[in-house]
From Swiss-Prot:
Organism the protein comes from: Yersinia pestis
Protein name: Dephospho-CoA kinase
Keyword Lyase: no
GO molecular function: ATP binding; dephospho-CoA kinase activity
Record's keyword annotation contains ATP-binding: yes
Gene that specifies this protein: coaE
Superkingdom of this protein's organism: Bacteria
Binding site for ATP: 12-17
Phylogenetic lineage: Bacteria, Pseudomonadati, Pseudomonadota, Gammaproteobacteria, Enterobacterales
Family: Belongs to the CoaE family.
Location(s) in or outside the cell: Cytoplasm
Segments forming domain DPCK: 4-200
Function: Catalyzes the phosphorylation of the 3'-hydroxyl group of dephosphocoenzyme A to form coenzyme A.
EC number: 2.7.1.24
């Protein structure tokens, strides 16, 4: 079984930058966001169920999911959010396991934005948190998504606190400074994870 390092961080923390740095070193990525998009592609049973519940206006003209409209439907409706999660989470989990099982590298990077929120951190061998201050999170999110400060604060408030996330971390990358430092930090962690993965394999075979 491949050693699994889960990568997480709050919105605007720069998870993609860190994930890409690992990918540049040849580490295979399994990305929960990409899988979440795949399970609701046109023609899937999940998208049909969503359209059946909310009507055809939840779809774009090309038949794909209108994510903004869906977010609006569920953002303040806990019951609808629970329904959507019960539909999608098993599908995402199934596809995640399929992808992880197909990896023959010493370790894989499992990129999960809501790792702590969904209580998934126990499914990884190691948890790496990308950390920045809330002010940086807000500024980056507003700039990237073109949203107001209030909207960005609402998203931040819907995620676990910085302290809760850090409490689950085995390793932390501070992504508030020089981007060049990220590559160095990732290279160091890569070396450590290769050692940990090798040790875990040896333990299995003893």
């Amino acid at each position: 079984m491949t050693y699994i390092v889960a990568l997480t961080g709050g919105i605007g923390s720069g998870k993609s930058t860190v994930a890409n740095a690992f990918a540049n070193l040849g580490v295979p990525l399994v990305d929960a966001d990409i899988i979440a998009r795949q399970v609701v592609e046109p023609g899937t049973s999940a998208l049909a169920a969503i359209a059946s519940r909310y009507g055809e206006n939840i779809l774009q003209q090309d038949g794909s999911l209108n994510r903004a409209a869906l977010r609006q439907k569920i953002f303040s409706e806990q019951q609808e959010k629970a329904w959507l999660n019960s539909l999608l989470h098993p599908l995402i989990q199934q596809e995640t396991q399929r992808q992880l099982a197909g990896i023959d590298q010493p370790y894989a990077l499992w990129v999960v934005p809501l790792l702590v929120e969904n209580g998934l951190h126990h499914r990884a061998d190691r948890v790496l948190v990308v950390d920045v201050t809330p002010d940086i999170q807000l500024a980056r999110t507003m700039a990237r998504d073109g949203i107001t400060r209030q909207q960005a604060e609402n998203i931040l408030a819907s995620q676990v606190s910085r302290q809760q996330r850090l409490a689950c971390a085995d390793d932390i990358i501070d992504n508030s400074g020089d981007p060049l430092m990220i590559a160095q930090h990732v290279a160091s962690l890569h070396h450590r994870y290769l050692k940990l993965a090798t040790a875990a394999q040896q333990d299995l075979h003893q």
